[in-house]
C-alpha cells in the first residue's frame, strides 16, 4: 500500500509540474489552444532548461510557422541530410531567432535563459569539442555570448558562421529563417549537399507522397511505426525548439 501511495504522489508531482510548464507556455505565447507536451524528465534534470525550452516553444509558435519549418527539416532529412546535425543547427538558429526577442518582451526570462545555457554547457561540454567539430564550437560560442551579455572574440571562420546565426534574429518570416538554416547546413555540415541532392527549391519540392512512401521506421521507436510519417514530423517539430542533448535526459 505504501508503494502505491508513493507512486501516486510521484504521479501527482509530475502532473503538477506538467501544468506549471504548460501554463507558462500559454502565458508567453498568448495562445491557450497550443498543444503542449511538457518535458518533466528534463525539468528534473534542470528546471531552467525545461522552462526556457517551454517558453521558447511558445514564443516560436507565436512568431513563426512551426509546421512549415518542421516539414522543411523532414524533407531535407528525406534527401539524406544528417538528422542529428540538421536538428542541432535548426535549434541554434531558432535560439538566434527568438531568444533575444523573448528577453526584450519579458525581462525576467533573461536570467532563466542564461542559467539554462550555463546548465547545458556544464552538463554537455565538460571537455571542449575538437577543432573539426564546428557545429559544437559554434553552439558554445553563441552560448558564451549570451552568458557574457556581449559578443566574445572567436576565430574569423567561426565568427562568420556565428553572424549568420544572429541574422536569424532579424528574420520576419519562416521561409527567411529556413534559408539561413539551409545555407548554414550546406556550408558548415555538408558542403557537397547541394551538388549531390539539390538546392533549397528541390528540398521544398519534395511531395507528401514521396515522404509517405519513405520508411521512417529507422528514425522512430517501435510503438510509433503506425502513422510513421506523422509521428516523425511531430517528433522533429517538438525537438527543434530545444537546445539540450535529449539523450542525456533520462526518464
Model-derived features: positions:
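Basic/hydrophobic alpha-helical interface regions
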Residues: 1-169
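Negatively charged
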Residues: 141-251
